[in-house]
Amino acid sequence: METGRIIKLISGVYQVDVDGTLYDTKPRGLFRKKKFSPIVGDIVDFEIQNTSEGYIHHVHERHNELKRPPVSNIDGLIIVMSAVEPDFSTQLLDRFLVIAHSYDLEPSILVTKKDLASENEIEQINAWLKIYEEIGYNTQFVGKHTSQQEVVATWPKGLIVLSGQSGVGKSTFINAFKPELNLETNHISKSLNRGKHTTRHVELFERESGFIADTPGFSALDFGHIDKDELKHYFIEMNRFGEECKFRNCNHIKEPKCHVKQQLENGYLAQFRYDHYIQLYNEISNRKVRY
């Protein structure tokens, strides 16, 4: 029995990496009976057959799991945004951050295409990134002249997931780091100002200190698993301020003696962050119940 990590899934075949050696495997029938499917990132025990093939017998317990796209055992999540084409959006960034925290992931922020942005755009983005840094996020702002190897060297060891909408430069960034991968890159649809999808499945690529994942681009984010009363925990500065609210179940909207709203009035909480919280809170409150 061998132990390795699933790095790719195509047409029911799971490619497992064991110290650089790849095996094409399939799960045993017992997984179907349990209605459980392995996913990319899983650590598995498998039996080798025919030298390079095998059958998966056991999936180790996952220490975390991203649902969309499905990836497990993530050590770091890099949310990739672009300065332009598509334009940088704090609203979209905050939604990615909420999703990350809801799955107990530690996100960092990477903004690309600095070389394509105007001086005013760069100044505005730097001001926003300063706010995110003060909240506690690691941020990076890079262009085509930035050393990608130096940027990657600052990331956590282990499995790193790159996440973000299409067209922001995820595949381009990986290609620059490891050109032999030659991933297909996105171009921007002029009519929609959005990237056309070229990464259609999750795949892990080996890097010096672990793996890096290129994930399908997101055009919509699903908050179906998040309850409105837990949303406040995923705006981490509000979560800290909320510890001093008079009522433990305070949602920081109309409740009296709310410390979060007091911090907002005093300038210690960014207005745009609070606005995004209220908007998302209302969306979750008004969604239709799923049966």
UniProtKB/Swiss-Prot annotation:
Molecular-function annotations in GO: GTP binding; GTPase activity; metal ion binding; rRNA binding
Residues that coordinate or bind GTP: T112, K113, K114, D115, G164, Q165, S166, G167, V168, G169, K170, S171, T172
One GO-annotated biological process of the protein: ribosomal small subunit biogenesis
SUPFAM superfamilies the record matches: Nucleic acid-binding proteins, P-loop containing nucleoside triphosphate hydrolases
Residues reported to bind Zn(2+): C245, C250, H252, C258
Keywords of this entry: Cytoplasm, GTP-binding, Hydrolase, Metal-binding, Nucleotide-binding, Ribosome biogenesis, RNA-binding, rRNA-binding, Zinc
UniProt xrefs under PROSITE patterns: ENGC_GTPASE, G_CP
EC number, as in UniProt: 3.6.1.-
Coiled-coil annotated spans: none
Domain CP-type G positions: 63-221
Pfam family, one: RsgA_GTPase
Cellular location(s): Cytoplasm
Cofactor: Zn(2+)
InterPro entries, A to Z: G_CP_dom (IPR030378), NA-bd_OB-fold (IPR012340), P-loop_NTPase (IPR027417), Ribosome_biogen_GTPase_RsgA (IPR004881), RsgA_GTPase_dom (IPR010914), RsgA_N (IPR031944)
Cofactor note as given: Binds 1 zinc ion per subunit.
A cellular component term, taken from the record's GO annotations: cytoplasm
PANTHER family to which the protein is assigned, alphabetical: SMALL RIBOSOMAL SUBUNIT BIOGENESIS GTPASE RSGA, SMALL RIBOSOMAL SUBUNIT BIOGENESIS GTPASE RSGA 1, MITOCHONDRIAL-RELATED
Functional note: One of several proteins that assist in the late maturation steps of the functional core of the 30S ribosomal subunit. Helps release RbfA from mature subunits. May play a role in the assembly of ribosomal proteins into the subunit. Circularly permuted GTPase that catalyzes slow GTP hydrolysis, GTPase activity is stimulated by the 30S ribosomal subunit.
Family: Belongs to the TRAFAC class YlqF/YawG GTPase family. RsgA subfamily.
Description of how the protein assembles with itself and partners: Monomer. Associates with 30S ribosomal subunit, binds 16S rRNA.
UniProt protein name: Small ribosomal subunit biogenesis GTPase RsgA
Naturally occurring in which organism (per UniProt): Staphylococcus haemolyticus (strain JCSC1435)
